[in-house]
């Protein structure tokens, strides 16, 4: 690491979030940290976002790019940063007061990522569901690697809940399969090359509002295909990164994880047909390998219903499954009924991409 660099670079990518970008910037500037630099990238907004951003003057570095997607926007800003660690904060999210004071002690050379819990909020800033995800601070990087091998991912928050060591972004570049998400292969790589620290406290706010919630209800075959392909491409990219570093040579990844198996069932329904018995069996077999307890039983139930229900009802079930607010309400009910006290997590990517 460059001994003359600052400790942390914050990058805030923005596209048409004039109503929220000021809150995001304010939440970082309010941390009162001298070793933090702030970059805000307007990715070709057509609203007043740029005016909101430039109003902060020299307290931030404002960058304007041509609507190339948040990945390219973030990496454009990254090239101008000097931080030993990088934090990407979505423009409609915000940090909690005092968050950086709790994160800073963990920003050590051997740490590849610090992750923390987020409180989902609506457009007015009101909580809409329980904090997510339920992180376990005792969980080790090796356990996270085991999770990736077993199910293709590990429990991690959306973009705004992660601070990554600089070399993670230096090594990944702009994947040709990824345009909108910066929390993909980067976060998969983290446990393989360092210690991942999990803070089981809410240190940020993750906004779910009409601009991103509605996307979950507008499901299409094309969108599901993109998600399925992106999941597979991330793992293939991860394998390339590990090989280039000479890391985890004996680790291999499957092609039939439960995450994509469930999406295959949904894709069939969206395409206008019921899932086949083989598609159902493949998904249920993956669940048996990867999960246990109440979470597995609920996903088994969802799968059987998607297979057995008439198409109109099955389509409604798919929309319910993919909607973050509906899923949050279901999780609240489950939590109230459960006496096991287990930590909850999801296999669905609930990001905004």
Where are the regions a protein language model picked out?
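Glycine-rich, basic loop-to-helix element that forms the pyrophosphate-binding segment
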Residues: 65-81
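A conserved acidic beta->alpha catalytic loop
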Residues: 27, 34, 42-51, 67, ...
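A conserved hydrophobic helix/loop-capping motif in glycosyltransferases and polysaccharide synthases
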Residues: 8-20, 24, 31-32, 41
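Acidic donor-binding/catalytic loop of UDP-sugar-dependent glycosyltransferases
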Residues: 48, 93-105
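Short aromatic/hydrophobic "clamp" motif used to bind/position activated sugar donors
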Residues: 86
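Conserved nucleotide-sugar donor-binding catalytic segment
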Residues: 79, 141-219
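Flexible acidic/His/Gly-enriched loops in nucleotide-sugar-dependent glycosyltransferase catalytic domains
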Residues: 70-73, 100-168
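C-terminal subregions of glycosyltransferases and related glycan-biosynthesis enzymes
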Residues: 150-152, 180, 205-353
